[in-house]
A protein has these predicted regions:
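Accessory carbohydrate-recognition regions in carbohydrate-active enzymes
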Residues: 1-361
């Protein structure tokens, strides 16, 4: 998580498509490292302090930026703010375990917790009370691509897609969408969109109160597209109120993301999902039992084994459908099988694939 290791804490299952990571590398003079001021390929850096939301579907240990999008952020303020440079917060009280991550946003007094299934994320926010907001930012991310689409399908739900790709800046045509369904598990929500309005000149700039600013859409609820857009949900929270956010993804379709959400999260609480994720990690990490050595040496070993099992990732939805490479086709894996992606051959050919074949065939 530091010294350019590009590893991250966060919530993920072994080989999971979904990986929820705290984001603290976006444009703040409070941070030591900034993703837009240097070569940077990870959503998190241990020494940084300015948190701007949780990103979904992330890479680990890579040398080029991609993915790291769909940023979700809780805030508390009388006036809604959707500019990440202004709504970000310092954070403290980090906790990280396999399948779970938590921190406390010091600016807002909000405790944030995240856990994951193979294809979905569950957030749990504990609010101090007062006017509270949950933001979905589609304009920011580690990807080198821009462009996203949103549509509100229920008072507490938005669906859409975001373009990803152009890994390492040179694979210019290697782009693809990620689809999502996000629900805020609370009634009595005000909701809307935002979009950054490009600057105008002359009288147009004088007449437009949203010129070169984020425009809030409080009544429009149809489809919205753009490079720097997002969705907001606002409500009056009671002191200590907990609100869950559930987000499912798919590389096939919005319908696939919805099926994943229903199949993996229906009827389950945050704590149940967390326990299942921890159980998956215990099962896979226990494939190798270490005898002897110090506790520190065991910690180093199992941390390395944990990192081994982050990639490759499953690519197919719960119905077996997945996108074919270098085309628009959709494939289907046989029942009981997985389709994997993020196979790296850069140095991993030395020992990673042999170990996976022997211990996790």
């Amino acid at each position: 998580t530091t010294n350019f290791g590009t590893c991250n804490p966060g919530a993920v299952c072994p080989s999971g498509m979904m990986r929820v990571v705290p984001g603290d590398v976006r444009r703040s003079d409070q941070n030591k490292y900034d993703k837009d001021s240097r070569w940077w390929s990870t959503p998190y850096e241990f020494h940084n302090v300015f948190f701007t939301g949780y990103s979904h579907v992330n890479l680990s240990g890579v040398g080029c930026p991609d993915l790291g999008s769909l940023l979700v952020m809780p805030t508390v303020a009388d006036t809604l703010c959707v500019d990440f440079r202004q709504y970000g917060s310092a954070y403290t009280a980090e906790q990280a375990r396999p399948g779970y991550y938590a921190n406390t946003l010091t600016r807002y007094g909000v405790k944030t917790e995240v856990t994951a299934t193979p294809r979905c994320a569950v957030h749990r926010y504990t609010f101090p009370g007062g006017r509270s907001h949950i933001l979905l930012n589609l304009g920011e991310g580690l990807t080198n691509e821009t462009g996203a689409t949103l549509r509100r399908t229920a008072p507490n739900e938005v669906v859409g897609s975001k373009l990803l790709g152009t890994f390492c800046y040179d694979a210019r045509q290697a782009v693809f969408p990620i689809y999502f369904v996000m629900r805020v598990e609370r009634k009595g929500l005000a909701a809307g969109y935002w979009k950054f309005q490009r600057p105008k000149k002359g009288v147009e700039a004088e007449w437009d109160p949203d010129d070169n600013k984020y425009k809030l859409y409080t009544r429009y609820a149809k489809e919205l597209s753009g490079d720097d857009i997002g969705a907001w949900f606002s409500f009056d929270a009671a002191a200590g109120e907990q609100v869950e956010v559930r987000l499912g993804v798919s590389f096939v379709s919005i319908e696939g993301a919805r099926r994943n959400l229903e199949a993996e999260l229906s009827g389950k609480t945050f704590d149940q999902v967390r326990a299942e994720a921890e159980g998956k990690w215990n099962e896979d990490l226990s494939r190798i039992l270490v005898e002897g050595g110090t506790e520190e040496e065991k910690t180093v070993f199992y941390t390395a084994l944990y990192h081994l099992l982050l990639h490759p990732n499953i690519l197919q939805d719960t119905d077996g459908r997945y996108p074919l490479m270098e085309g628009d086709g959709i494939g289907t894996v046989p029942a009981g099988h997985n389709r994997y992606t993020v196979f790296s051959l850069w140095d991993t050919y030395r020992n990673v694939h042999q170990l996976l074949s022997l211990v996790y065939p």
